[in-house]
Amino acid sequence: NDEFLYTLLVPERARTLFPCFDQPDMKAVFTLQLDIPEQWVAVANAAVESETLHEGRKLIAFQPTQPLSTYLFSFVAGKWQQLAESRDGKTIVMYYRETDPQKVAQHTIIFDQVFASLKWLEDYTGIPYPFDKYDLVIVPGFQFGGMEHPGAVLYNDKRMFLGPHPTIEEELGRMELIAHETT
């Protein structure tokens, strides 16, 4: 729409975006450049390498990804708000479009749960988080609970920003979703 866009290439839709062998066992390194309106922001699997402004447009070049299956390649662009939190040398950025301050205030719980999931996974496996970054994008009306794109995890807004009196099931569901997408 005129406000934002995102990719969702699971299970074998990458071939609709670019020519590829669209099967999970074959991985590739992706480089991406996006030409977007100047007031938009963009998020992808890898960190931003450079931004260039020209005549109301923004050209964003991203660093090359680590090897990924094609269905895990992702980018998001649009008018997003963002919050960042750093702990133990890791910074996570949350992108969202929610305007209700009570819902946005849940960012503390969301960050707590993401950092806890990452720490548990690293402790359990003995392997540090293998990707350059972990950003999360809370997408209005996202058709699944979430999608584990490395470096740019997408989440459904209703599953992340709960109502004023969430049930235990809703709270546990959010934690389970975060743990699932983190692994």
Residue ranges and their predicted role:
Residues 8-12, 19-179:
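Hydrophobic helix-coil surface modules that form long, contiguous segments used
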Residues 183:
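Short active-site segment of divalent metal-dependent hydrolases/proteases
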